[in-house]
């Protein structure tokens, strides 16, 4: 179907048929598929270009369909843009509008619906029209025209009026007249007509004719004036004058809205008041104006207000008859009368008040205020309410039969009596859901609950009364009252000198106490001449005094009063440092003087007036040194413990330096925790002074006495418990540590730990033996231990002391040596050469056990042969022990030669004992009776109670190393002893 381009009235339906020669194969395919695409929804259609190619949006799979309905990059949709911004080319702020989000078709559709101002809705009205006309006339004058003369305005600007003007004209308004209410004019006209009718009826015919003529003239005049007013009326809206509100009613309320007759009466009363007011003002005048009178007439309603036009214009002008009427009293005169005088007239006209009355007014005196009355109100607490209301006791009621209910009532009553009424309110709220509490709401058991509540309240009040009496008495108790109660003798006053010196001492002590917390200003007025630090330089002394004033005095500080312009900044800073040092020196000097004065006066007489000494002998106690009262600052060097350095993996900075003895921080520390190093040094010195050939028995006796003199020190240390199973099953390799330092003291805590370790080993053996007997196992008894095996100990304080008591007697080394063999004595001497023997009780225990076993084996021939060489072994052991004391003394002195020899000796001994480490075995020939077991348990308990004094923790590392070496030596001796037994 063809159509012409010029014909706009034709409507085309369908797709036009194109010529085949004008279209390519691809284009024909697109046209053929167009019909199929229309059948698909919009989101399933593929976007293709003009030649039928599918549009590609990106280099990935979803690039063929992008955007809403495939509109990205097309003319119908938005085109993405790259954001570019640099220093030279800044990104522009684009203002967006509704057209930025619309397609071309939408913009075309909205083109005719644009909102624009039109002349039809011109708010200026005729002003805009006149302005347009003037502008057109100006343009016409400037440009030449083919038509001579002015062009009509209708040809230049179309004559249009606004919608407001059209509405006013439809409502009856005419152009050029003001917009006002015409009701006033109609009301005025109606009133004039009413007056004319009234005059016509009252007058004669001649008068009526004249009146008619006059009325016609007046009508003409009124018409002329009306037309004139209409022509020259103002275009402004009238301003309505608001009448002030002078009544007591609400805004907009009209009480006479439905009662017009009352409103008319009120208006007449108001006019009468106004007339009386005007008559009073014009009193004494012969001619009174008639302006207050209004002419009667028809058509005046009750709701209409009087105006100027209501005046009687036909009156004579003067009211002479008003003079004949009595002038009523004014309102001000009536108000001057007393209100009470009006009552004398009575209610009724025939009633008269009597001149004298027999009635007498009876007056009552106010109540008398009691002497103990308190005008301040005190709110009662729940307890006080209970106290006041508990006077009336409820009657006794038997308890309910239900035991659970009785217990519940008694518990609730006790709780309410103790805590207050709010607990009862809580139970009442609970009774709404729980029927068990119905006794609170007049239920079963209510009277029993009231009785129990009263009893508990009385009991609680009786308990509280003694406490209150006691608290009141304790508040008033003073030192004097307490002395009188206890029967103490009153204090005797001391002499006048002591009493006079007491305030001075108190003042000095107060000043010394305040000196630690407050800074006292220095006053240079009372300083002597020799205490002024810069007396040789008066200018500098003046600056120093000014410096002290600025430092210790407040207030405003002026600028530099003393000119110091010649000094540089460095000199000022140096001078200020000098001033600070001088001020500190003066302050210290004053404090020292106060302390010296306090020490001279003493504090012995301060408490003489407050306490009475029990005996006269106590008065001779010397006064204490008061300087020791005040703490002093002390500086000492802190050094970490070696074990601490080892745990933190750092090198001990004080390695090789002697450790100083720590000062006890209190007297209790010095008594209880006595340092062990001092006792050891004393023992070493005493042993070095003594001759070398001193017998071992004598040394043991002296040291046993020394140990007996210090029982408190031994019992004061606390032993650290050692795990039993760890002592049994622990490996010796766990305790291997480096060699101890020669110059470090030994820690007795570690010594006690090692002793506990050995004792726990013995306890473990006994425990396993008893356990085997209970289980019925054949436990082989231990072989008697040869007397040459000793457990190594770490405490070197008692090197040669063996103070173990047995049956009340002291056992010495001489008695033990009688049962030893020569070979065993040599091994004992060799083993004890390097082992410190501080653990005296442990050694004594082992010697006692060895002696007991040796007595049983004296019958053996081998043991008898060994007794022959006991004397030689005694001498060798004594020499070796003396040699050991000398070597230990050299070790403590810290010589380098001794250190090297000790290390060599220990390494040699370690090599010699390494081959004797064998597995532990039990001897089948040991005695295992119950009596020996009980004795051994008793000795172990006694050893467990032993306490060693605690010393400094810096000896920890040395003791750990020493402990490991002692354990190794004891294990070596034990293994060597058992290997000999098996060989036999």
Curated annotation (Swiss-Prot):
Residues 814-859 form a coiled coil. InterPro entries: DUF1604, G_patch_dom, Surp, SWAP/Surp_sf. Residues 882-892, 905-922, 934-946, 975-984 have a biased composition (Basic residues). Residues 131-153, 464-503, 679-717, 775-803, 824-984 are annotated as: Disordered. Keywords: Coiled coil, Growth regulation, mRNA processing, Nucleus, RNA-binding, RNA-mediated gene silencing. One of its GO terms (cellular component) is nucleus. The keyword Coiled coil applies. One of its GO terms (molecular function) is primary miRNA binding. GO terms for biological process: miRNA processing; mRNA processing; phloem or xylem histogenesis; siRNA processing. Residues 131-144, 473-495, 843-858, 947-974 have a biased composition (Basic and acidic residues). Residues 697-709 have a biased composition (Low complexity). Functions as a component of microRNA (miRNA) and small interfering RNA (siRNA) biogenesis. May assist Dicer-like (DCL) proteins to efficiently process and/or recruit the precursors of miRNAs and siRNAs. This is G patch domain-containing protein TGH homolog.
